[in-house]
Amino acid sequence: MAPAPSFRGHQWTYNPVRGSCLLLLLLMSNLLLCQGKSCPSCGPDVFVSLRKSFTDRFMNAASLSHDFYNLSTIMFNEFDEKYAQGKLYYINVTKSCHTNSFHAPEERDIVQQTNIEDLSKWTLVLLYSWNNPLHHLVTELQHMKELSNAFLSSATRFENMSEKLQAFIERQFSKIIVPVLNTMIQARSSWTGLPSLMSSDEDRRHSEFYNLFYCLRRDSRKVDMYIKILTCRTHKTC
């Protein structure tokens, strides 16, 4: 089996022809489902209507990713205000993110040059990487009685948003799932903060919560940017 491709930001170049072909193939795959069947929707305007449905799905995903990032920012700011004032949790927090080893691009000019396949791969890499820590984050927050029900509800909603975004990318780009998993295995990235999150030492526990909320906000911003650029590509507006 060939090794999984390497996705370093400085090596990426966006090929508009390849990107357009990928979108066309995705649309044509839906058309092929109608062959040999009685299909009322397979009239002369089927391509236009399929493309509209395709782009509408991306618009919905872009709206969801926007809310995804905004909610992560709200949660970080609220936790920071309530628990981190006068603390030194922010020191070295950028080095604590478990997704650092992926080197997922965050500069917009680099992301804009990235092809559709790699953008979708990076989106899934980040979302998959948060499944375990996000589950434990939501679970452990339930034990913090001083947090408002609204905050706990936001954390649960955020986890649901992540699942919906994953499902969307998986449906649109199913062939990238194995390469994504290979990339994650090769990066040897894993979250090791569970002992701190469950510690009886309140300061240690709060420090880990702070790290998670900080890194979650950073990575959700990347996911939002990737999906918005994928969306503008489908609309041919960028």
UniProtKB/Swiss-Prot annotation:
InterPro entries: 4_helix_cytokine-like_core (IPR009079), Somatotropin/Prolactin (IPR001400), Somatotropin_CS (IPR018116). Pfam families: Hormone_1. GO terms for biological process: cell surface receptor signaling pathway; female pregnancy; mammary gland development; positive regulation of biosynthetic process; positive regulation of lactation; positive regulation of receptor signaling pathway via JAK-STAT; response to nutrient levels. N-Glycosylated; the glycans terminate in either N-acetyl-galactosamine (GalNAc) or N-acetyllactosamine. Terminal GalNAc on Asn-linked glycans is greatly reduced prior to parturition while lactosamine-type N-glycans remain unaltered. Its main location: secreted. GO terms for molecular function: hormone activity; prolactin receptor binding. It is found in: Secreted. Placental prolactin-related proteins may play a specific role during gestation. This is Placental prolactin-related protein 1. It comes from Bos taurus. The lineage of its organism: Eukaryota, Metazoa, Chordata, Craniata, Vertebrata. The gene is PRP1.
